[in-house]
Design a protein with these regions (language model features):
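Mid-chain, well-packed structural core segment of small domains
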Residues: 70-84
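N-terminal beta-strand motif that seeds the catalytic metal site of vicinal oxygen chelate
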Residues: 1-20, 68-72, 120-123
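Vicinal oxygen chelate
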Residues: 1-2, 81, 85-123
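Core segments of cupin and vicinal oxygen chelate
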Residues: 4, 10-49
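Conserved short beta-strand elements that form part of the metal-binding/catalytic scaffold
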Residues: 30-64, 113-120
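Short hydrophobic/aromatic beta-strand element in the GNAT-like acyltransferase core
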Residues: 41, 71, 103-104
């Protein structure tokens, strides 16, 4: 089944409007003009992120302990972190990286651990 790809990623939030505002206005995702009732959908370039009503619960005894619920690729991590700072988003571990990528992790308003990652382009 090599033609499989992710269609929808769902995140839970007790305050759906505040969390949708965060993904639209802070992260910069495009909110689709139509969505299913109270479940906002964001375009991820052929896949979708939807915010569902509910209480997010972190994994118990997780290993590693700070692995994100979802990681979103960005072209310019420096610009993305500046945008997060401008909106008062705490980034508890700062910008991290290795030879292949750089990333920053933070919590959305619902408490979901999210990561923005920039992959290093090699010529």
């Amino acid at each position: 089944m090599s033609d499989l790809r992710i269609a929808v990623v769902g995140l839970w939030a007790e305050d759906v409007p505040a969390t949708a505002h965060f993904y639209r206005d802070v992260i910069g995702l495009s909110l689709l003009a139509h969505h299913h009732g109270e479940r906002p959908h964001f375009d991820l370039g052929g896949s979708y992120l939807t915010i569902l009503k509910g209480r997010p619960v972190p994994a118990q005894d997780a290993s590693p302990p700070h692995f994100p619920v979802v990681a979103l690729a960005v072209e310019d991590l420096d610009a993305a972190t500046e945008r997060l700072r401008a909106h008062g988003v705490e980034m508890p571990w700062g910008v991290e990286g290795d030879a292949q990528s750089r990333w920053v992790k933070f919590y959305d308003p619902a408490g979901n651990l999210v990561e923005l990652v920039q992959f290093e382009h090699r010529a």
